[in-house]
Amino acid sequence: MFLTETHIQVRDMTRQFADNVIRPLAEDLDRDSRFPAEIYDQMAELGLFGICVPEEMGGPGFDTITYALVMEELSRGYASIADQCGLLELVTTLLVRHGTADQQGKWLADLLAAKLRPAYCITEPEAGTDVSGIRTTAVRDGDSWVLNGGKIWIHNAPVADLGFVLARTDPEAGHRGMSIFVVDLHAAGVTRGPKEIKMGQRASQVGPLSFDDVRLPADALLGIEGRGFHMMMSVLDKGRVGIAALAVGIGQAGLEAATDYAQQRKQFGKQIADFQGVQWLLADIAKDVEAARLLVHSAAYKIDAGLDATKACSMAKCFAGDMAVQRSSDAVQVFGGSGYIRGFEVERLYRDAKITQIYEGTNQIQRMIIARELLAKGAAA
């Protein structure tokens, strides 16, 4: 995939930021499971939030390939930081595509400037991959809505100001009975549960939210009532490209760490890079990182070109997630016992990689989507 001068400039700027600002803090953030507030604000100053928000709405106006490049470079520094960029891209895309001019004016600028931290509130105890199982409800009461229910595993829940909440507005209408509401998470009736202690990406704050008779104004409804499920699905392709790019960043960081270590570590009187077994590990990491990167760029190109990108996005997300887990494991193997010890980057990368096979749709679901697309539309590219 050939990159434009703009692509390269943004990529290199993000890479420099990751090297100089993110990577030096990554181990401390992981150890302390701390929200990276100081990095978050700097990302906003650099214009790394809402990458694809049009210029006329106050955003950078970049394409999806630029978004993928930024996600990879941020993740190469620390995946938890890339998660923030990905989350902002999801919610700003929803606002750009489905918000009224008043809603965009009310929230968009503050999201881009890091004055408001968002949460994307979909998952519930009985509704993970199967979104049709959501039980959170929003009921009309005069000119307002009353929200009741609970969400779990919500990214940013402990620190967010604004929740984009999927709720059921018509219990009899199935997927057509869901709507999205923009909720002030400091409002009366909103309760935050304890922060989850996670295996990886520990600086990403995740926790439950509960809503007890939370009264919402009429303009909290985003888009058209009953279209919430379809609105959510409309941003999934871009979300999957983002997670795939994040996974590529993990793989790239592991490749760099393993290559450097193999040339420094000596056993039996020579560098371990001289041993064929280690060389094969490095070669396998390198080829799969590059293959995943090309799948990501291909999927991003299709989104930007207005082509049907569903299969391409699922292929990129599935392959890149599996790659990140397997090849970060290989990077640990190159390090040997050192790779199993906290404080070595590859140990963190291995833990950070696992979630890329799970969120934004499990890789089993991605395989189902790929097969469904093949069987419905044929195997021709």
PLM region spans:
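Short, charged, solvent-exposed linker or helix-capping segments at domain edges/interfaces
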Residues: G177, R192-P194, A218-E225
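Short Gly/Pro-enriched turn/cap motifs at secondary-structure boundaries
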Residues: Q84, L111, E126-T129, W153-N156, ...
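Flexible, small-/acidic-enriched active-site or ligand-binding loops
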Residues: G133, H186-P217
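Alpha-helical interface subdomain recognition
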Residues: M1-A82, G86, H98-Q103, D110, ...
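Flexible, glycine-rich active-site loops centered on histidine and acidic residues
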Residues: T92-H98, Y120
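A short, Trp-centered hydrophobic/proline-enriched beta-strand micro-motif
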Residues: A114-I122
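A short core secondary-structure module
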Residues: D143-S144, N148-R192
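Conserved hydrophobic/aromatic beta-strand scaffold that supports enzyme active sites
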Residues: A119, G133-T137, S144, L162-L166, ...
